[in-house]
């Protein structure tokens, strides 16, 4: 069977990184653990969210659920009190929004994570945190610009940045707003860390569902899962004929979804008032991996990367799809469905896995 890797994601496979993250062992010869290092949830409005880490780890993962209301925010990520809204020139970044030409800034005071937006956002970042090297950041975020409506597709940003400081590790992660709005009560930043030399600890990611088909079907259903604020999903489609993966939450097939996606680095396509999130890049075998912000009382935002096999064999390059999806329903997700929109079937070997934490 051809092995598929997701586009613009760390290497993940059925028994790979997600299995590692949800594992119960540690150490160089065993499984690694992404552990929670710290979090901050606002209880009022603020221009800054800062998280002090319980310990420094060489690999960091940052998840953000931001609530902003009707006024714009424009975030800058910075580390160890170096930067924020000025006073530092130790950062450089590149950001691309909605398929437009990327912009760059050098010798500045923080990493641009958002561009100006309002309402709600879900974001995640991976950061290398080695003392002897500049700290490199890669992140993806999705913004919901129309609260309560599926008639507007989410916007998105791709961010890469660096903090040039060497000789120490990141021990504080923060973001500050330089626009007119504020981060509202309920906004949250969570920082996870991984050290391959750890031998004890508990993974923050809990397996919520693991479903593998044994026959033909048009749906892979997680069944009821525990209500968690942060969800990480992975699916593989073993296709017979023209079968393609799309997504629903809580078996809701009403027109409550909207999607922004870009295939193979092309321009963005948007879909509004749909009965599913449009994940498929091509019909046929495909592998997808992504994160969902499942914040209570907020619309649900998905960031997904899918790789499609295309024609089997090394003579054809795989297809890549990046997806930003939204459900306008604010009820929390307690089940996930991968649904087929083609004339073929999902067949035996197709699977869906879900992890989560609060």
Descriptions of predicted regions:
Residues 1-2:
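Sec-dependent, cleavable N-terminal signal peptides
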Residues 11:
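N-terminal glycine-rich anion-binding loops that anchor highly charged ligand groups
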Residues 14-15, 22-358:
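Surface-exposed molecular-recognition determinants
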């Amino acid at each position: 069977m051809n092995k598929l890797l997701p586009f613009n994601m760390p290497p993940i496979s059925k028994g790979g990184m997600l299995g590692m993250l949800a594992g119960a062992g540690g150490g160089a010869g065993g499984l690694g653990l992404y552990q929670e290092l710290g979090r901050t949830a606002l209880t009022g409005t603020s221009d800054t969210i800062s998280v002090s880490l319980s310990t420094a780890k060489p690999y960091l993962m940052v998840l953000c659920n931001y609530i902003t209301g009707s006024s714009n925010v424009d975030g800058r990520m910075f580390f160890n009190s170096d930067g924020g809204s000025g006073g530092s020139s130790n950062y450089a970044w590149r950001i691309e929004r909605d398929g437009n030409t990327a912009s760059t800034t050098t010798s500045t005071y923080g990493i641009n994570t958002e561009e100006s937006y309002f309402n709600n956002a879900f974001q995640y970042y991976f950061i290398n945190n080695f003392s002897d090297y500049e700290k490199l950041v890669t992140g993806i975020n999705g913004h919901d610009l129309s609260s309560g409506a599926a008639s507007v597709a989410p916007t998105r940003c791709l961010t890469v940045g660096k903090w040039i400081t060497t000789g120490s590790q990141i021990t504080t992660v923060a973001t500050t707003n330089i626009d007119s709005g504020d981060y509202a009560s309920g906004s949250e930043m969570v920082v996870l860390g991984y050290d391959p030399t750890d031998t004890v600890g508990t993974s923050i990611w809990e397996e919520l569902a693991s479903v593998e088909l044994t026959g033909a079907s048009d749906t892979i259903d997680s069944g009821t899962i525990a209500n968690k604020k942060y969800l990480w999903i992975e699916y593989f489609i073993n296709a017979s004929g023209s079968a393609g993966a799309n997504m629903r939450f809580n078996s809701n097939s009403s027109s409550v979804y909207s999607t922004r996606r870009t295939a193979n680095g092309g321009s963005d396509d948007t879909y509004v008032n749909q009965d599913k999130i449009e994940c498929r890049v091509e019909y046929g075998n495909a592998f997808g991996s992504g994160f969902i912000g499942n914040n209570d009382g907020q619309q649900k935002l998905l960031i997904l990367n899918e790789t499609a096999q295309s024609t089997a064999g090394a003579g054809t390059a795989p297809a890549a799809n990046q997806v930003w999806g939204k459900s306008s329903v604010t009820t929390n997700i307690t089940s996930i469905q991968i649904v087929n929109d083609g004339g073929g079937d999902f067949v035996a070997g197709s699977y869906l896995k879900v992890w989560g934490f609060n």
